[in-house]
Amino acid sequence: MNQIWLKVCAASDMQPGTIRRVNRVGAAPLAVYRVGDQFYATEDTCTHGIASLSEGTLDGDVIECPFHGGAFNVCTGMPASSPCTVPLGVFEVEVKEGEVYVAGEKK
């Protein structure tokens, strides 16, 4: 089965330390993070409480949820602090010809 890729933005549109929400038709939104020169993507909804992680605070490779302050590693989706215990789904990201693309399905 071929992977569907979603075009997010030009890589230059996201500075290091920024987050962008990606709305998908018929699916839950994603959060795309720029950590240094690398891009990562996870589910945008916190697994602990219904909050948008793209509205949280990115500190290095850790996103803090704006709802209860729990955190996740954006590279792996693994919880980084309580009260979060359930990992986030992560999505492959590629940069091609200066454009950021996110896979339509989880890794």
Swiss-Prot record:
Please name one Pfam family that this protein belongs to: Rieske
Q: Which GO terms describe its biological process?
A: carbazole catabolic process
| Cofactor(s) named in the record | [2Fe-2S] cluster
Q: How does activity depend on pH?
A: Optimum pH is between 7 and 7.5.
Domain Rieske stretches: 6-102
> Which amino acids does the record list as binding [2Fe-2S] cluster?
C46, H48, C65, H68
Keyword hit for NAD? yes
Q: Which GO terms describe its molecular function?
A: 2 iron, 2 sulfur cluster binding; dioxygenase activity; ferredoxin hydrogenase activity; metal ion binding
| Dependence of activity on temperature | Optimum temperature is 30 degrees Celsius.
- Database matches in Gene3D superfamilies: Rieske [2Fe-2S] iron-sulphur domain
CDD domains in the record, alphabetically?
Answer: Rieske_RO_ferredoxin
Q: How does it assemble?
A: Monomer. Carbazole 1,9a-dioxygenase complex consists of a terminal oxygenase component CarAa, a ferredoxin reductase component CarAd and a ferredoxin component CarAc.
Listed name of the protein? Ferredoxin CarAc
Species: Metapseudomonas resinovorans (Pseudomonas resinovorans)
